[in-house]
Amino acid sequence: MFMTQLESAVAGVVTKEMKVVAEKERMDEEVLRSLVAAGKVVIPCNKQHTSISPEGIGKRLRTKVNVNLGTSKDVTDYDSEIEKVNRAIRLGAESIMDLYTHGDTRIFRRKLIETSPVMIGTVPIYDSVIHHQKDLGELTAQDFLDTIRLHAQDGVDFITIHSGITRKTIDQIKNHKRLLNIVSRGGSLVFAWMSMTGHENPFYEYFDEILKICKEYDVTLSLGDACRPGCLADATDVCQIEELVRLGELAKRAKQYGVQAMIEGPGHVPLHQIQMNMEIQESLCDGAPFYVLGPLVTDIAPGYDHITAAIGGAVAGMYGASFLCYVTPAEHLALPNADDVKDGIMAFKIAAHAADIARGIPNARDIDDTMAKARQVLDWEAQYACALDPERARSIRESRAPEEDHGETCSMCGKFCAVRSMNKALQEEYIDIL
């Protein structure tokens, strides 16, 4: 009889996926199993996704990075998207979310799942309009459920559903004045559907039906935050927290049913509120893994939002966020190109690594210490090997090499290099500067 990762963990069974994750994390298998059983770690791994190399998300594990990809009606270039996927995997992203909103979405989704070793996530409500070829207001609750089943059958490892907003939220949004209302794309569609049809949110009303589908294929739920703040002024407001309370309740229901769940979080949050947001989520959601978009710590940096978001991501990770959704320089401006994707990934790999060091993840700082030793002896090849982006590090140094270079220094300091001077001084060698 098939059991989900959560059911197996509760039953005391260490699955082959848990063994892989435990080895990657250098963690005892039984410790990992107990964390999965407690709902504090998830291993998104659809039984149909046979090419996956599973990763764990949650307590005591390395911080993971997700990359959002997908075409829109204005930019449809499948070859370009495939190249972005390949680049994301090469650069170390642990997850890709397929957010296609135009064209034959299923062909790309199936190809992605068939070949990708990383976990794949989707937002089924995007695909509902395309798959059923209906306008939003014409879709039925059954249409949404059918799309979820289709994604599960195709092998999607986790799905984002915005189950936390209800008819009550409509009144809250109208009465509680926000500067930016709802900025979640999926959340705005659910809000609009409820407004047009007069019906309750189908992802909330039929949550038990969704759990049945997820359990059948072992799809992890990513409970989306429709009311995440889209600007600093809306951070940590009534709408955000009220929804988070409901998401925590839904996560507990999923756990009781044997379905893994994680919680999505903000958004745009001032730096001084990030720790508080992480602690509120920890309390309300019983330690379920927290998946955050950034958060962005200022609203005024379009073109540089990979930086504003990575700052927030590092702090969020330090205080407990387990999963960071990358942000690119194109955020708020355009569909990201391949260079934007790389910039976003590198910013968030740095943020995730910095958070792991701050949280004391075992062995997280080893590579930093190895880099320091390589710098101490001016071993450039060893430094490149330690770098998150060896190709870029090598390219920068070699394109601006010092005129008098014997493999020791760089053009920043040349013979004024502090490391070179100290090495020679400690070895009682003559220090030539001119």
Annotate each PLM feature.
Residues 171-195, 229, 233-235, 272, ...:
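Catalytic or ion-coupling anion/metal-binding cores of large enzyme and transporter domains
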Residues 4-298, 304, 310-323:
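Alpha/beta enzyme core
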